């Protein structure tokens, strides 16, 4: 694929028409012992078995977490500074968020909509801990939004909110995390998994007390009917859909959804 910014991690900026292995740090060998990967606009990231994060490609906004930013691409995987014991990674457009084993969330890179959740819109070149949150067990980022699922089944969101995709009933960007509400204006508290889309989010629900499926919640942009609501109206709050189904996996992209 496209490789102008070295986002394929092959040590150069030449496009590839067949799969090519990502090189190791400093171009030595290949990148190994990987348990998860994620990609930004022009950046690749990998999480290792020992909780380290490596990034390569564009570092224009400090999204590689090296303490600096540059228009020059980083051609080989480089270890993210300041973080350890990471168990999940998720990247937005030009930033990344990372969940550690203690339930804390860290982020670095572009922050123009507050998507790093640190109370401001200043870009960061080193990972910073998200403020006012704890007990997080799952994260999902897309474009300029970050979502967190708590151990208790609550959902929090931060960042861009023009399409009301944070589910707090407003269209105001948030620089600190807010709880997602349902159409009864109560906090969502039965979430099982989360998946961020382009200005929307899907939340699969736990089964009820009798073991019955409850489907999922959808929030945000709906120009193309991607929220399964049968219309193209924006969802300001978490809206119930597919209620009789037990949703196992969700995949979202711009204007399209798969379950």
Predicted stretch roles:
Residues 1-259:
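Eukaryote-biased RCC1-like beta-propeller repeat architecture
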């Amino acid at each position: 694929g496209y490789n102008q910014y070295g986002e394929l991690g092959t040590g150069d900026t030449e496009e590839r028409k067949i799969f090519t292995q990502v090189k190791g740090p400093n171009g030595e060998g290949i990148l190994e012992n990987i348990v998860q990967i994620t990609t930004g606009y022009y950046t690749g990231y990998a999480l290792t078995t020992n909780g380290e994060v490596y990034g390569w490609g564009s570092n224009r906004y400090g999204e590689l977490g090296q303490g600096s930013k540059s228009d020059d691409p980083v051609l080989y995987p480089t270890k993210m500074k300041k973080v350890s014991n990471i168990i999940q990674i998720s990247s937005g457009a030009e930033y990344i968020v990372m969940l550690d084993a203690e339930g804390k969330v860290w982020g670095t890179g572009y922050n123009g909509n507050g998507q790093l959740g640190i109370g401001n819109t200043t870009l960061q070149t080193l990972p910073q801990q998200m403020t006012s949150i704890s007990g997080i067990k799952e994260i999902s980022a897309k474009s300029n939004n970050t979502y967190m699922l708590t151990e208790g089944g609550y959902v929090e969101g931060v960042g861009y909110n023009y399409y009301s995709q944070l589910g707090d009933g407003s269209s105001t960007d948030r620089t600190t995390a807010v709880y997602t509400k349902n159409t009864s204006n109560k906090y969502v508290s039965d979430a099982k998994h989360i998946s961020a889309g382009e200005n929307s989010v899907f939340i699969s629900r736990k089964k009820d007390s009798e073991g019955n499926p409850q489907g999922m919640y959808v929030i945000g942009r709906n120009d193309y009917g991607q929220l399964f609501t049968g219309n193209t109206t924006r969802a300001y709050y978490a809206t119930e859909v597919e209620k009789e189904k037990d949703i196992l996996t969700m995949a979202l992209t711009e204007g399209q959804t798969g379950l």
